[in-house]
Amino acid sequence: MTKHLPTISDISPLLKAEILAEALPYIRSYHGKTIVIKYGGNAMVEERLKESFARDVILLKLVGMNPVVVHGGGPQIDEALKKIGKTGTFIQGMRVTDEETMEVVEWVLGGEVQQDIVMLINHFGGQAVGLTGKDGGLIRAKKMLVANEKQPGGTIDLGFVGEIEAINPAVVKALQDDAFIPVISPIGFSEEGQAYNINADLVAGKMAEILHAEKLVMMTNIPGVMDKNGTLLTDLTAREIDGLFADGTISGGMLPKISSALDAAKSGVNSVHIIDGRIEHSLLLEILTEQAFGTMIRSR
């Protein structure tokens, strides 16, 4: 049986009022600060969650924060690949990307998915602008090679999977200054103009670092980081994370997510959280309430 996840309708009027009152100190604290949000998973698929996310981002902007959205699109890419008879292959949480897959990734992320997010935010009264790594030289990338765990010293070529060489934040800052909400697709480009598929978690983490973000929030399809017994780990340090990597608790798609979150924390991002994007208005609950939510990542 599918577990019921709460919606805004489940919250009593009194609790709603208490939440609004509770939000004031957080609004003051984050006023004028950059909040980077990695948006992905079910929150990008279910209509009610898509709408609640758009409204949340708009509210953050209206109360004086500077939200920057970095989106994924794994399910949409998988669906597009399925239509042309291809299946996704992942190594260490990274999608192996041949030339044909790269074309699909560019079309899905830079077109279909991004346009949907931008249009929804604009529909509800916000001002969103979509960007890829090519716009304003935002994300310069190079080919990523990952370590071959079965062959010490060896590497694995993932195709057109990229790692970030540099980020030019000028275009993002210009949009923020003009009251726009940047929506960034995780596609980078080399100096020669070659497009690369970059894991969205890595882009979000590096964007938070370069923009000197106050907060990085990563939305997932689970309550946060779980131990091997399925218990939520609400607070993790670098040392604890190393242990979870070593014993295999953190694996697959969580590898780049946790690595990126930890790197952001080490780089000076004051608050890094991994939260359950399946809960309606989870973004506001994380940023504007006292309630512990998801997993907080700390550098020490």
From Swiss-Prot:
Its main location: cytoplasm. Keywords: Amino-acid biosynthesis, Arginine biosynthesis, ATP-binding, Cytoplasm, Kinase, Nucleotide-binding, Transferase. Its EC number is 2.7.2.8. It holds the Pfam family AA_kinase. It catalyses: N-acetyl-L-glutamate + ATP = N-acetyl-L-glutamyl 5-phosphate + ADP. Catalyzes the ATP-dependent phosphorylation of N-acetyl-L-glutamate. Transmembrane segments: none annotated. The record marks 38, 257 as: Transition state stabilizer. Substrate binds at residues 73-74, 95, 197. Pathway: Amino-acid biosynthesis; L-arginine biosynthesis; N(2)-acetyl-L-ornithine from L-glutamate: step 2/4. This is Acetylglutamate kinase. The gene is argB. Disulfide bonds: none annotated. HAMAP family: ArgB. GO terms for biological process: arginine biosynthetic process via ornithine; L-arginine biosynthetic process.
